[in-house]
Structures are given as structure tokens and as C-alpha cells.
């Protein structure tokens, strides 16, 4: 089953593909999630040895989806004590098989040119 998020006009639409057509399953306020099309079905399972820094896009009964750069990561929801806030820019790492969530620090810098 393919799922995607369509974010536009302040709304977040969860869509599922049925027989080649996208059907809307759920509509919610987008909050701080940027407008765009997010193909959740392309999400790779989280690597527990890596720290994942990015925006939390969606959470369902099984997974928490996070955008890391241009890729999507899915975290097993049962590994969280509390699901992170949707739209939040967070760092997720694993310790003793549990997901640890912390506010991500944005890296701001400038390149020097000669």
C-alpha cells in the first residue's frame, strides 16, 4: 500500500493509492510542515546506529516518518516513549533499543571565499 502526504494551503492530506489512483484518507492542519508532496512509501527503515536529524512529517499506528535531507526515514512507533511533535525539527537516535528524541540544532555557517 503506497501512502503519501500532500501539504498545501495549510492542510495536510494523507493519501493512499488504490488501483492507480490516489484517494484522500485523512485531512488535518499542516502546522509547521512545509508545502510539498512527501512520498512516505519511499521511507527506509531507521538505522539504529545512526543519528537522524530532520523534520517529523507523520505518525500512524505503526511508524513515525521523518524527512532527513531529501530522503525519508521510518521509525518503529513502539520504540518511542512519546511521539515527537509533527513538524518539529528533531534529532532521533537509539539507545538500548529505545528512540531518544532531542531538539535539533540548526547549523548556520558561511563559506569564506578568497
Feature map (PLM): residue ranges:
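Short, flexible beta-strand-to-coil junctions
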Residues: 57-63, 67-72
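Flexible glycine-rich surface loops and low-complexity tracts that mediate binding to linear polymers
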Residues: 4, 9, 84-105
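Hydrophobic residues embedded in beta-strands of well-ordered beta-sheets
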Residues: 12-13, 63-64, 99-101
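A general sequence property marking short-to-moderate contiguous segments
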Residues: 7-43
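Non-Sec secretion/translocation targeting segments of pathogen effectors
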Residues: 65-66, 106-114
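Structural detector for short beta-strands of small beta-barrel domains
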Residues: 31-61, 89-94
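Short, exposed beta-strand/loop patches in secreted or surface proteins that constitute
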Residues: 5-6, 54-58, 82
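Beta-strand/loop nucleic-acid-binding surfaces
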Residues: 69-86
